[in-house]
Amino acid sequence: MTDLELQQLVATISMHDFHRPFQHRAYFNARLRTTGGRYQLASHDIDINPKMLTDFDEATLIGVIKHELCHYHLHLTKRGYRHRDADFKRLLAQVGGSRYAPAPKQATARPYRYIYECQRCGRRYYRKRRMDTRRYTCGRCQGPIKLV
């Protein structure tokens, strides 16, 4: 699904479920990591996490879109648009949006690039970042450390 198709889907859901037009931008934002979507108060745009489409089904995506549209329409009509507001909870239940987006699947942990070993006791240190072995010693025995 492209950003244009997402824009059309959001506009369709807005007219069908909220009976109001969506007049701003909706697009995928790959920088969203822990949330399904985001409504921006200043620009009124809606960002959607692309993982809601790739990792889950279309019903989940539509639930997230309805959630963000609740923020959008309530904010523009100057009513309670925050999660804790009764207006928000009422409208979300009325349109059948999702209260919570499912947690995106976590990427597999990157393997450690650097393995250091104490010359005296043999303890290993696994690091993602390089370190200056002349400045550091083993935390257990104070022996010198060497890159393996």
UniProtKB/Swiss-Prot annotation:
Gene Ontology process terms (BP): response to stress
Pfam families reported for this sequence: SprT-like
Highest taxon, organism lineage: Bacteria
Keyword Transport: no
Necessary cofactors: Zn(2+)
Start and end residues of each SprT-like domain: 6-147
Signal sequence region: none
Cellular localization per UniProt: Cytoplasm
This protein's UniProt keywords: Cytoplasm, Metal-binding, Zinc
Name of protein: Protein SprT-like
Originating species: Lactiplantibacillus plantarum (strain ATCC BAA-793 / NCIMB 8826 / WCFS1)
